[in-house]
Amino acid sequence: MAKLTVEDLDLAGKKVLMRVDFNVPIKDGVVGDDNRIVAALPTIKYVLDHQGKAILFSHLGRIKKEDDKPGLSMRPVAERLSNLLNMPVTFVPVTEGPQLEDAIAKMEDGQVLVVQNTRYEDVKDGEYVKRESGNDPELGKYWASLGDLFINDAFGTAHRKHASNVGIASNMPGKAAAGFLMEKEIKFLGDAVTNPVRPFVAILGGAKVSDKIGVINNLLDKADKVIVGGGMTYTFYAAKGIKIGNSLVEEDKIDVAKEILEKAGDKLVLPVDNVVADKFANDANTKVVEGDIDDGWMALDIGPKSIEEFKKVLADAKTVVWNGPMGVFEMSNFAKGTLEVGQFLGTLEGATTIVGGGDSTAAAKQLGISDKLTHISTGGGASLAYLEGDVLPGIAAISDK
């Protein structure tokens, strides 16, 4: 999929509209984790270095009523961006109208402007009208009219069809490009799904089979092995007739799990032992069991034999995609499976290793292996949608080369 990228554009003197993902946590008017802002800096700096005018659009949180607006202003984000760039950043507290148009008209080459939260457009005169998140055609057209070029660097919203990504891009044919972050996501996730170096192994964790059915099915067609861990394991156990005690199970997904098991044959690798606990708490009594789990006990992590089995499968892999934890990662006594698998990924030589999803990303950070992995995806839902083989509207709307 050859899409226009920022390097294909002549930026000098141009008003460059940029969709970034600055949806960051804000407490008492201060940005908490600024990772997403930092991730967009290479593209922003490239535009400034090439004498473009960078006009940044992002959503922040969800806005369903007027009262939501004051706490979700982009002002603190603009202030943090100013610190990171070490230069002034203009913040415009509105999403449309003369105040915004005048501020853009006054910009000089190499300057940055941050537009107010795009989701302010979701509430008008007290009504929840979803102009931004419903991709109102007039809004996309209006925003597109404010610039000469468009760069989408917000992979995290690529699976959504909003006025600020699809709306703007579809009104700027031939002038909508991917930023560096978006380009990297398309390259690594895209190659993994469509053209992986083999053996290709996927590691899927997390609590619910229902969240991952599409991903499992798509990756069973593409991968050489699919390792399953985390809470969704026990719905597969139930489908195989293994007793699961009080472990998490989705009763209404047991039939789906059976179908997946039939389709998968020996491609699907399940844990062979589990760490079980007598209550859902870090200080629970625990033991390691193989096979059936007794009533009154629940599996909260994969066991030591499973960890070794998974490592054997991963040892020869040339492409690995990891999405989701192997156990209840947020409790230290049930984090071992996730941490050991992550640690092992960091040691693989000559393999492309891709991590997506909040918990897996957090595990990689905790282990200090982020720099040993090839790519850490910035999009949770967007990464999953990509791995499911979905067409992502935000990417589809970017101009082809």
Swiss-Prot record:
Pfam families: PGK (PF00162)
Main location: cytoplasm
Listed GO CC annotations: cytosol
Chain residues that bind ATP: K212, E330, G357, G358, D359, S360
GO BP: any one term: gluconeogenesis
EC number(s) per entry: 2.7.2.3
GO molecular function, one term: ATP binding
Pathway where this protein functions: Carbohydrate degradation; glycolysis; pyruvate from D-glyceraldehyde 3-phosphate: step 2/5
Residues given in the record as substrate binding sites: D21, F22, N23, R36, H59, L60, G61, R62, R119, R160
Keywords, in A-Z order: ATP-binding, Cytoplasm, Glycolysis, Kinase, Nucleotide-binding, Transferase
Compartments reported by the entry: Cytoplasm
InterPro entries: Phosphoglycerate_kinase, Phosphoglycerate_kinase_CS, Phosphoglycerate_kinase_N, Phosphoglycerate_kinase_sf
Keyword Transcription: no
Catalytic reaction annotation: (2R)-3-phosphoglycerate + ATP = (2R)-3-phospho-glyceroyl phosphate + ADP
Similarity-based family: Belongs to the phosphoglycerate kinase family.
Complex formation: Monomer.
Protein name: Phosphoglycerate kinase
Species of provenance: Limosilactobacillus fermentum (strain NBRC 3956 / LMG 18251)
